[in-house]
């Protein structure tokens, strides 16, 4: 598992930053994106998929979380 930062870019797109690899990618899909549940699988623009344990409510961004890589780019 890796520590990642999830935030909005200046263009208003959701992005995931992985400091360990100095990688920042746009999040193209998120499994749960409701007010009462947020997280799950995050699909990145480069094809990689990460899993963030779902939160019981939508967090205030930016946020640092633990994420597990499910699929490499």
Model regions: which residues?
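Intrinsically disordered, low-complexity regulatory regions of eukaryotic proteins
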Residues: 13, 36-38, 44
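A short, sequence-level motif marking secondary-structure junctions
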Residues: 22, 31-37, 54-59
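Short amphipathic alpha-helical surface micro-motifs
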Residues: 23-25, 32-34, 44-49
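Residue-level detector of beta-strand structural context in well-folded domains
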Residues: 4, 39-40
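Short, compact, well-ordered microdomains
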Residues: 41-73
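N-terminal acidic leader/helix
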Residues: 2-31
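A general secondary-structure signal for short beta-strands and their flanking turns/coil
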Residues: 1, 11, 37, 60-62
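Long, low-complexity, intrinsically disordered terminal regions
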Residues: 18, 38-39
